[in-house]
């Protein structure tokens, strides 16, 4: 099947996250992505550890398959290089604070005057307008402001650090990609270009839809970690086995809960986790702690009760299930070493053949293609 974005040109002015992951997804679906970077050092991710022979692994994971142009956006030559590209580009992605692109002469109105069909995607923490539009922040701030971080629970009954970049990726990358694709369809149907205002803090709200229903609409006070999906019930929480490994018990439905209780031989009088949830959870914890995870894993798998032993990222990468589905079969070349590429949620039919090996362009590698001066050697 032909890659659906094979004729789409994307100009990428973003750094770190979430923009680079969004443009990576577009690239994987066939779009040509030109990444613009500072001439001196490139974007910040090029400087992050770990590295392979000086090449940042994190940068390569998020930026392979893109062209690199090192360009000082404040220089006199910048618009000479950019204007021909702006005239034919389909999508522009940026994640500066509001007003920065305007000062560079690259704001939406200026670009739209050059190309009325441009789909201009701005990704920020709090959006282009509002009292906090200019506020600095990172993922931790955005999930904190959205209310979802308050729903986690740690050993001291306080919110814990999130395990992943929920706002950056879930509130920034994914909404950006979805809305860019919607805008492309709308334009194809006779519409014009548009300015997409993606706010990571707003995109995070959907991750706790149930808290919106219970807390905002129903007006209930949701205690920290006290809801069904945040550890408030014995049948949906993490427990520790005798070897210290964690077991994820997700037996929400009654049939799964009873199957799990049978595995650990929980007495019938304790199986009603609604009546005395603390006592029930304590006994479940005691029983799971009596044996190592290797003992429980096959029993829980055989019972098919939504209970699994937590894996590390390295264990997950060699899991037979993911191997069978080819999740990690795409490869990257990082300074001559072939490594697994980051799995992305794009159907295989829409991507290039898995046998191709991706590579991140060196800083300014594509400057000659677009008439830009080569960057000075670092």
List the model feature ranges, each with a label.
Residues 1-189, 223, 332, 347, ...:
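N-terminal helix-loop segment corresponding to the beta1-alpha1 unit
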């Amino acid at each position: 099947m032909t890659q659906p974005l094979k004729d789409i040109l994307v100009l990428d002015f973003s750094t770190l996250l979430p923009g680079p992951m969004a443009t990576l997804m577009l690239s994987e679906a066939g779009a040509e992505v030109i990444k613009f970077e500072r001439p001196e050092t490139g974007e910040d991710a090029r400087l992050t550890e770990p590295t392979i022979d000086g090449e940042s692994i994190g940068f390569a994971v998020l930026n392979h398959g893109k062209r690199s142009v090192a360009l000082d956006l404040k220089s006199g030559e910048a618009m000479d290089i950019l204007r021909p590209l702006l005239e034919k580009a389909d999508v522009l992605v940026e994640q500066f604070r509001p007003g920065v692109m305007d000062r560079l002469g690259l704001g939406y109105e200026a670009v739209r005057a050059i190309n009325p069909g441009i789909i201009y995607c701005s990704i920020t923490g709090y959006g282009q307008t509002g009292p906090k539009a200019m506020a600095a922040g990172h993922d931790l701030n955005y999930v904190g402001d959205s209310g979802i971080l308050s729903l986690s629970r740690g050993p001291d009954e306080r919110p814990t650090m999130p395990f992943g970049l929920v706002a950056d990726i879930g509130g920034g990358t994914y909404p950006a990609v979805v809305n860019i694709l919607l805008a492309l369809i709308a334009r194809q149907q006779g519409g014009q270009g548009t300015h997409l205002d993606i706010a990571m803090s707003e995109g995070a709200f959907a991750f706790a839809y149930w808290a919106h229903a219970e807390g905002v609409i129903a007006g209930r006070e949701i205690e920290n970690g006290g809801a069904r999906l945040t550890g408030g019930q014995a049948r949906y929480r993490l427990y520790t086995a005798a070897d210290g490994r964690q077991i994820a018990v997700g037996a929400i439905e009654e049939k799964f809960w009873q199957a799990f209780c049978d595995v650990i031989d929980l007495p019938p009088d304790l199986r009603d986790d609604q009546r005395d949830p603390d006592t029930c959870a304590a006994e479940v914890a005691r029983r799971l702690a009596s044996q190592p995870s290797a003992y429980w894993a096959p029993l829980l798998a055989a019972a098919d009760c939504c209970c699994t032993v937590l894996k590390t990222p390295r264990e997950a990468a060699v899991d037979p299930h993911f191997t069978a589905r080819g999740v990690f079969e795409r490869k990257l070349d990082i300074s001559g070493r072939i490594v697994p590429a980051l799995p992305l949620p794009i159907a295989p039919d829409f991507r290039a053949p898995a046998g191709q090996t991706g590579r991140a362009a060196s800083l300014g590698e594509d400057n000659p293609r677009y008439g830009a001066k080569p960057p000075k050697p670092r």
